[in-house]
Amino acid sequence: ETILDIIFRGDQPSAAVPGGSVFNGIVSLGRMGINVGFISETGNDRVGNIILQFMRENHIPTDHVNVFPDGKSPVSLAFLNEQSDAEYIFYKDYPKQRLDVLFPKLEEDDIVMVGSYYALNPVLREKILELLDQAREKKAIIYYDPNFRSSHKNEAMKLAPTIIENLEYADIVRGSLEDFLYMYNMQDIDKIYKDKIKFYCPRFICTAGAEKVALRTNLV
């Protein structure tokens, strides 16, 4: 998913940029000249046009972005603290018909990145599973980033079976300590890996803001 982030420092808006966990990763790869594709949706409106233009400027094809005629493109307000950590408020008005788009052709060792609530949303689950099944069939590498926000922490138990299913599909799981605080109320990296990740996926990358990145595998 991509969304237009309106960034606030203090109480004043300072910028408006397309964002999203998976989207930000794709943007970085596109800027490096790596061949990428992005599956998403946006509205036929000014916000949607900003997102599509940003993609083109960063060498990301828009072939697999569904532009829906009804509803509105999603927007978030991101309030940054002194450490530049963001607290989000989301505004979304999607149509009933979702993600009506053809998936790109996958090949062995392609990397498929999925994440955020987009990969958990019951409305989109059938399409997400279709993509994950194609990736598994073609022997692509599945990279899962939960990017679990505080706005969904009260749904964590209800979403747990879907999270587990995503972990089972994943070849690599990358999450932040903040994600696992909201998902499991856990902050110990070793305990998160041993109790929540390892059984489903042996490869785990955990970030902690400005602190060191941690790697856990069945060999490390």
Model-flagged regions — what are they?
Residues 10-19, 220:
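Short pre-catalytic strand/loop immediately N-terminal to key active-site residues, enriched for Gly-Thr
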Residues 93, 117, 147-151, 178, ...:
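Active-site beta-loop-alpha junctions enriched in small/polar residues
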Residues 138, 152-220:
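Conserved phosphate/ATP/ADP-binding segment of small-molecule kinases
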